[in-house]
């Protein structure tokens, strides 16, 4: 290993990590509102409004508290959801990934709810390692169909996911009352 190469360690996130994960997440969607997808809008973490005929997104008031409540709930049932964090050899948070199993006894699929890498750690394999960890977890649970969502203008993420075998499946629309 080269002297400046950072070792990536993937570990399960716990309730004790929720505040740090929330800080990373809220900091990112504040700086990059294009990350906000319909999932964040549905859970009240993000909001959208129409400006000049286009949907504009931003973090919603109380976003951090709403996101922490959601992530703590998801951490409570490892049978259907799991959150991992990537840390370096000093324990510094590099990123995280949240994965969920959706469906019933007959039809189940995997959903990568969030995957986010600290901007200083991008390009070093953190995202790939987190994503592969989630895919392996889904496969260990017998899940083959895996989906994710991404904000409509998050083009860098779209290219990233396409390079890793994901394909564009559909569009989501929200009624914006006049």
Language-model features: locations:
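Conserved GNAT acetyl-CoA-binding A-motif
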Residues: 138-149
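Acetyl-CoA-dependent GNAT
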Residues: 15, 23-107, 113, 176-177
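Residue-level recognition of the GNAT/N-acetyltransferase active site
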Residues: 118, 151
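Conserved acetyl-CoA-binding loop-helix of GNAT-fold acetyltransferases
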Residues: 114-117, 123-136, 159, 163
């Amino acid at each position: 290993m080269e002297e400046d190469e950072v070792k990536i360690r993937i570990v399960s996130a716990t309730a004790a990590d929720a505040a740090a994960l929330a800080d990373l997440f809220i900091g990112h969607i504040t700086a990059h509102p294009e990350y906000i997808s319909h999932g964040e809008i549905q859970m009240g973490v993000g909001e959208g409004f129409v400006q000049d005929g286009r949907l504009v997104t931003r973090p919603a008031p109380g976003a951090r508290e709403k996101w922490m409540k959601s992530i703590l709930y998801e951490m409570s049932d490892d049978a259907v959801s799991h959150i991992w964090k990537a840390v370096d050899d000093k324990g510094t948070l590099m990123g995280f990934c949240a994965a969920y199993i959706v469906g019933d006894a007959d039809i189940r699929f995997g959903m990568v709810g969030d995957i986010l890498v600290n901007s200083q750690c991008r390009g070093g394999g953190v995202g790939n390692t987190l994503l592969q960890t989630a895919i392996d977890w889904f496969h260990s649970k017998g899940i083959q169909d895996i989906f994710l969502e991404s904000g409509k203008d998050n083009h860098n993420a779209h290219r990233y996911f396409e390079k890793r075998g994901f394909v564009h499946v559909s569009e989501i629309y929200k009624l914006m009352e006049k």
